[in-house]
C-alpha cells in the first residue's frame, strides 16, 4: 500500500512539473486529485477486452437487449443534459466563441467546469460500449479506432479538468454532446431488428463526427491566431489529438462506405460472367454459405 501511495505521489509530482499548477477550483472533485484511479480504470478497461474475448470465445453471445436499451437511453439523456447546460453556462459566462480564457467569467466558469466533469465521467461510463461488444461477441466492432478513442478521451479529459476546466475547453464537448444524442439514439434503436430498415442514416453519423472534429480544430486554432490568454501548448496538443481522430475516422469512413460499393459491383459482374455466388469471397474470408 505504501509503495502504491509513493508511486501515486511520483506520478502526480511529474504531471505537476510538466503542466504547472492545477486549477484550484476543481480540487477535491471526485477522481481528479490523483491520476492513479484514471490510469487503473483505463488498464482495467484494456484488460477486460483481452480477458473478456478469451472468456467468450467458446460461449454463446449474449443478447443484452434490455440492458442496452436502458444504457443507450441513459447516455442519450446525459448527453442532452450536458448540451443544454454547456450552452446555458457559456451564455451566462458571456463566452467569446473565438477565444475564451480560464478566469474571466466567475461563476459561469465554475458552472462550465461542473458540466465538463460530467463529460469526463461519461467517458468512463462509455467504456461499457466495448464491454457490451465483448459480451455480444461483436469483435469486428472492437477496432483500434474504437479502443484508442475510448481510452484516450478518458485520460485526456482528466488532464483537461485539472488544468483547463473551462474557457476554450467548452466548445468540443458541446458539439460532442449533440453528436452523442444522435449516436446513442441510433444505437438504442438498432437493438430492435424491426427498426433496422429505418436506420439508413448510419453513414451520416460518421460524416457528422468528422464535421465535429474539423469545427473543433478550427475553433481551437482560432485562439492561436487571436490569443486571449488560454494556454498555447494546450491548444496545439488538442488540435494535434483531434487530427489523429480525423485521420482514423476518415479511414474508417472510406473503408466502410467508399470501398464496399466497388466490391459489390465486382461481385455482381462475376455472377453475370457465369461464376456462381458460392464461389464469391466475402469480407471476412468465408464463402457465402447462404448461396451454397
Swiss-Prot record:
Annotated keywords: Endoplasmic reticulum, Fatty acid biosynthesis, Fatty acid metabolism, Lipid biosynthesis, Lipid metabolism, Membrane, Transferase, Transmembrane, Transmembrane helix
Signal sequence range: none
UniProt GO BP: alpha-linolenic acid metabolic process; fatty acid biosynthetic process; fatty acid derivative biosynthetic process; fatty acid elongation, polyunsaturated fatty acid; fatty acid elongation, saturated fatty acid; linoleic acid metabolic process; long-chain fatty acid biosynthetic process; unsaturated fatty acid biosynthetic process
Segments crossing the lipid bilayer: 29-49, 67-87, 115-135, 153-173, 175-195, 205-225, 230-250
GO cellular component: endoplasmic reticulum membrane
Any one GO molecular-function label of the UniProt entry: fatty acid elongase activity
Organism superkingdom: Eukaryota
InterPro entries reported in the protein's UniProt record: ELO_CS, ELO_fam, ELOVL2
Pathway the protein contributes to: Lipid metabolism; polyunsaturated fatty acid biosynthesis
Organs and tissues of expression: Highly expressed in testis, lower level in liver. Weakly expressed in white adipose tissue, brain and kidney.
Enzyme class per UniProt: transferase
Family the entry assigns: Belongs to the ELO family. ELOVL2 subfamily.
Function field: Catalyzes the first and rate-limiting reaction of the four reactions that constitute the long-chain fatty acids elongation cycle. This endoplasmic reticulum-bound enzymatic process allows the addition of 2 carbons to the chain of long- and very long-chain fatty acids (VLCFAs) per cycle. Condensing enzyme that catalyzes the synthesis of polyunsaturated very long chain fatty acid (C20- and C22-PUFA), acting specifically toward polyunsaturated acyl-CoA with the higher activity toward C20:4(n-6) acyl-CoA.
Subunit structure: Interacts with TECR.
Annotated protein name in UniProt: Very long chain fatty acid elongase 2
Gene assigned in the entry: Elovl2
Amino acid at each position: 500500500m505504501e509503495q502504491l501511495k509513493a508511486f501515486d505521489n511520483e506520478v502526480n509530482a511529474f504531471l505537476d512539473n510538466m503542466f504547472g499548477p492545477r486549477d484550484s477550483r476543481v480540487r477535491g472533485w471526485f477522481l481528479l486529485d490523483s491520476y492513479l484511479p484514471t490510469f487503473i480504470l483505463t488498464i482495467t478497461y484494456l484488460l477486460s477486452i483481452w480477458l473478456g474475448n478469451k472468456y467468450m470465445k467458446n460461449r454463446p453471445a449474449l443478447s443484452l437487449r434490455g440492458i442496452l436499451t436502458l444504457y443507450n437511453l441513459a447516455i442519450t439523456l446525459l448527453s442532452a443534459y450536458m448540451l443544454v447546460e454547456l450552452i446555458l453556462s457559456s451564455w451566462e459566462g458571456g463566452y467569446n466563441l473565438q477565444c475564451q480564457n480560464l478566469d474571466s467569467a466567475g461563476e459561469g466558469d465554475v458552472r462550465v467546469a461542473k458540466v465538463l466533469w460530467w463529460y469526463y465521467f461519461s467517458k468512463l461510463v462509455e467504456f461499457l460500449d466495448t464491454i457490451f461488444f465483448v459480451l455480444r461477441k461483436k469483435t469486428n466492432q472492437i477496432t483500434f479506432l474504437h479502443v484508442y478513442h475510448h481510452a484516450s478521451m478518458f485520460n485526456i479529459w482528466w488532464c483537461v479538468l485539472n488544468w483547463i476546466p473551462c474557457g476554450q475547453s467548452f466548445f468540443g464537448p458541446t458539439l460532442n454532446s449533440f453528436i452523442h444524442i444522435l449516436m446513442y439514439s441510433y444505437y438504442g434503436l438498432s437493438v430492435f431488428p424491426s427498426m433496422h430498415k429505418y436506420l439508413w442514416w448510419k453513414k451520416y453519423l460518421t460524416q457528422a463526427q468528422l464535421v465535429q472534429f474539423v469545427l473543433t480544430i478550427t475553433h481551437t486554432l482560432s485562439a492561436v491566431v487571436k490569443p486571449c490568454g488560454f494556454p498555447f501548448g494546450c491548444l496545439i496538443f488538442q488540435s494535434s489529438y483531434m487530427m489523429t481522430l480525423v485521420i482514423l475516422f476518415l479511414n474508417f469512413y472510406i473503408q466502410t462506405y467508399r470501398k464496399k460499393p466497388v466490391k459489390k459491383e465486382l461481385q455482381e459482374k462475376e455472377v453475370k460472367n457465369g461464376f456462381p455466388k458460392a464461389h464469391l469471397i466475402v469480407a471476412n474470408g468465408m464463402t457465402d454459405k447462404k448461396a451454397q
